[in-house]
Amino acid sequence: MPHIYKQPLGIFQGFVPTLTDAEVSFIAQRQLLTLPENGELPDDIEYEVDLKVTFANHRLKRAYIALQAWKKAVYSDPFNTTGNWHGPHVCGYTGVFCAPALDDPDVAVVAGVDLNGADIAGHLPAELGLMTDVAMFHLNSNRFCGIIPKSFEKLSLMHEFDVSNNRFVGPFPSVVLSWPAVKFIDVRYNDFEGQVPPELFKKDLDAIFLNNNRFTSTIPDSLGESSASVVTFAHNKFSGCIPRSIGNMKNLNEIIFKDNSLGGCFPSEIGKLANVNVFDASMNSFTGVLPPSFVGLTSMEEFDISGNKLTGFIPENICKLPKLVNLTYAYNYFNGQGDSCVPGSQKQIALDDTRNCLPDRPKQRSAKECAVVISRPVDCSKDKCAGGSSQATPSKSPSPVPTRPVHKPQPPKESPQPNDPYNQSPVKFRRSPPPPQQPHHHVVHSPPPASSPPTSPPVHSTPSPVHKPQPPKESPQPNDPYDQSPVKFRRSPPPPPVHSPPPPSPIHSPPPPPVYSPPPPPPVYSPPPPPPVYSPPPPPPVHSPPPPVHSPPPPVHSPPPPVHSPPPPVHSPPPPVHSPPPPVYSPPPPPVHSPPPPVHSPPPPVHSPPPPVYSPPPPPPVHSPPPPVFSPPPPVHSPPPPVYSPPPPVYSPPPPPVKSPPPPPVYSPPLLPPKMSSPPTQTPVNSPPPRTPSQTVEAPPPSEEFIIPPFIGHQYASPPPPMFQGY
């Protein structure tokens, strides 16, 4: 880590211990106790403070009140940065900058605060809203906790706001939306959560840094209205598609989507981004082939799409983009590439094609692994993320409706295919995206963004159940998820505090392009305006290995860059995780319970005969399998069959199911299953099993399986909340 710091900050090297969760909670509570009603300050608050000192003007008095309140809110100041914060001469305080007021050149006011890298622990008092002349607020690489006070809305002259690499929590700080002149917003490396407001992208901003937080939901369609040159979404939990409006971002130079739960096909509109230098969509769940429009990315220098589920051919023209320096498409399922795309064919371009399905190339996936994905290509013309109707899936579900129930008992074998899951190596890659989402609905309805809506309804309806198997297969995909420790990622970056120089805000947009290729930029990266400010490279430390690949991001995205490229390779090991699914056969019984339901759902279908009984299994997931089994017995006949049902799929048990010829009746009794479903929370699961058993494993799953991976609908990341202890 020492190499991350510049001279002025060299003394920081691991010298001060980080805050414990208990301390963070304590500081947050201190802030809550001091916040006024609604977090707003009365206009006459300064008159409520009895001061025996005189000030050059009223504004400096207000600044004094604010800074003294802030000093009292400091919990730890290892370098005594605020040691001289006493007396009326606030312009002499360390980290405080004064300048002539914009509305009156004869009046000196506090125009900026720069405490970058001071390693101060504490919270932000509401009184800071008194410094209404502040245009620059830089706090990156400290240990501030709590929330951004609502009183910050009064800082209407704010131009640069950098609170990166701290421990702030709560929803996106909406106060930034009230600043008419703000150009630079950096909230990286914190614990902000929830949705990002669509209004953020409607502001006239130069740079937006959201990476390494806990944001969820989809990326707003308003993204295309942004005037920003740099936008980073990396290392969060965004799901869904890349908005097609992205093609309208005329000023965009760098955009990072790395390590989220995004999926579907790439929208062809990306090809309109003729000014983009860095595009990183690695470690997600994108599917389909690369749009031909990508040939329009004529300014592209760093292009990373590794760690996804992309298939097809890497076109020659993409590998010959005029300014291309680095193209990484490892950990996908490409089965062909142009001659210019072969690593080593172009000395001036770094190419990485490992862990694909390319013939005659080293370090590729096994034939079995590739077959699972390549045999089920995704039709992007029908994918909603690419602008298609995405109705193919629903149509399929109706067709299988009642006819296939009996025929598909054998399909259960397909479940192993999910085991192959195409995303094995990438899985380790990705860290958090998939896991959180899958738990909520193993049904996988949301995952199949394109077809999920249709598939889910069918599942519940009598015929649709057939598609349910697809969800099961999807489950393996989530398993692949590299979703292992995005959060851990976040904290390591702290080092890059060299931001004090940031004051020069004008440099915002320029930094990005220049810094791209050279990893060194990270130090310069901090506040966009001043390359130095961007040093917040806290991210670099975290993702130190990848820095080379994403060095471009450093320009404005220094921290993210490191986070971006190398990671994919690191996680190659995870693929094994999916191999287990094949064994699913033996564990079918457990599947019924809950974890495996997605993968094991196929087995239940096999037991179509005892579907009635099987419907109860849904309850088993809840851990009350017996009860459900008993209740259904009357309608279905013999509860025991259910127990046998798990095994039947593959072995002797099948006879029992056969004995329960009732299955045919089952179709008539479908009504009963519904009843069963009503008791259990998983009603959908119950009704489908009866009929779907046979249908479930159908070809539909295979075709859909691959599409579902996108996880487009998952927004239920429950994990994030737990992370906020004490709030």
Curated annotation (Swiss-Prot):
Region spans: Disordered: 381-727
GO CC entries: extracellular region
Matches recorded under Gene3D superfamilies: Ribonuclease Inhibitor
Protein name: Pollen-specific leucine-rich repeat extensin-like protein 3
Top-level taxon in the UniProt lineage: Eukaryota
Main location class: secreted
LRR repeat intervals: 19-43, 107-131, 132-154, 156-179, 180-202, 203-226, 228-249, 250-273, 275-296, 297-321
Native species: Arabidopsis thaliana
UniProt keyword annotations, A-Z: Cell wall, Cell wall biogenesis/degradation, Glycoprotein, Hydroxylation, Leucine-rich repeat, Repeat, Secreted, Signal
Example GO BP: cell wall organization
Signal peptide: 1-22
Post-translational modification: Hydroxylated on proline residues in the S-P-P-P-P repeat.
Cysteine disulfide partners in this protein: none
Subcellular location per the Swiss-Prot or TrEMBL entry: Secreted, Cell wall
Bias kind Pro residues: ranges: 397-419, 446-457, 466-479, 492-677, 718-727
Expression tissues: Expressed in flowers, stamen, pollen, and pollinated carpels.
Glycosylation sites recorded in the entry for this protein: N80, N326
Role played: Modulates cell morphogenesis by regulating cell wall formation and assembly, and/or growth polarization.
